[in-house]
UniProtKB/Swiss-Prot annotation:
GO terms for cellular component: cytosol; endomembrane system; endoplasmic reticulum-Golgi intermediate compartment membrane; Golgi membrane; SNARE complex; vesicle. Residues 1-333 are cytoplasmic. A motif (IxM motif) lies at residues 245-247. Keywords: Coiled coil, Golgi apparatus, Membrane, Transmembrane, Transmembrane helix, Transport. InterPro entries: SNARE, Syntaxin, Syntaxin-5_N, Syntaxin/epimorphin_CS, T_SNARE_dom. CDD domains: SNARE_syntaxin5 (cd15844). Residues 355 are vesicular. Residues 263-325 form the t-SNARE coiled-coil homology domain. It is a single-pass type IV membrane protein. Belongs to the syntaxin family. It is found in: Endoplasmic reticulum-Golgi intermediate compartment membrane; Golgi apparatus membrane. Mediates endoplasmic reticulum to Golgi transport. Together with p115/USO1 and GM130/GOLGA2, involved in vesicle tethering and fusion at the cis-Golgi membrane to maintain the stacked and inter-connected structure of the Golgi apparatus. This is Syntaxin-5.
Amino acid sequence: MIPRKRYGSKNTDQGVYLGLSKTQVLSPATAGSSSSDIAPLPPPVALVPPPPDTMSCRDRTQEFLSACKSLQSRQNGIQANKPALRAVRQRSEFTLMAKRIGKDLSNTFAKLEKLTILAKRKSLFDDKAVEIEELTYIIKQDINSLNKQIAQLQDFVRAKGSQSGRHLQTHSNTIVVSLQSKLASMSNDFKSVLEVRTENLKQQRSRREQFSRAPVSALPLAPNHLGGGAVVLGAESRASGDVAIDMMDSRTSQQLQLIDEQDSYIQSRADTMQNIESTIVELGSIFQQLAHMVKEQEETIQRIDENVLGAQLDVEAAHSEILKYFQSVTSNRWLMVKIFLILIVFFIIFVVFLA
């Protein structure tokens, strides 16, 4: 037997009637026609919305205050570290300046070595005067520049000396004095090279005068001799009807040209010697400036010497005190040994005779 299917709008499952929905509201007529065991549904309850001014919140004032305190402590830490950072920056700047001066000193030393090699040459035909003059001028300018840079470095140390520690200031002054001593040594070497160059120029001049003295002394006699020869040649030419060749003008022009070359060479050497003398004078002024700078460092060196002497006296006093303490400890040790021996003797007597 096939069951009968009932079709409904919502309360069906594949055409099978399931019954009334629990949420279905029955009308009064339908309620009266239903069985008596089904209870009527309660009336719908109206939902009351919450008041608009009421909302959930949490007091986070303490968290805000703690965040402010942490930020303030960070700022205070940064401000406390600012002097240290400033000192490190100043130290790096001083190091860079000293490094640059040392590099310039090494470059100038290399140029001075090249000038020394050129200045010690004594040959008349291998004299590179132009290159020597250029190197002399360049080295002189470098020495003046290095002198100014060292003075600026010393002024920097003086300006920042109050902000740095005593040991750091002493170290900086030591570096400045070392650079000054290197510059003074290089200036002294440069002065020695210029003096050698001056002596070589004097020797070359004396040699040139020695080799060119005979032609110059025979120069006044040349026109008369050449004139007599010209007259004889003129008489012979007039007698024979040939053309006379006068050699007076050509020889005179050659001798005059030789004299002009000698004069120009002597003048160039005189100018070179004057330049060398002026350079030596400038080096003397640089030595005076270096002496003044070293004199200013004399107080620091004397203070260091006094500190060394004081430290030596303190070490000697500490050594004497240590010796006294050692003697006292040694005497106390013997006293303790005596007491220990006495106790052992009493213990032996007590054990042997009284036991």
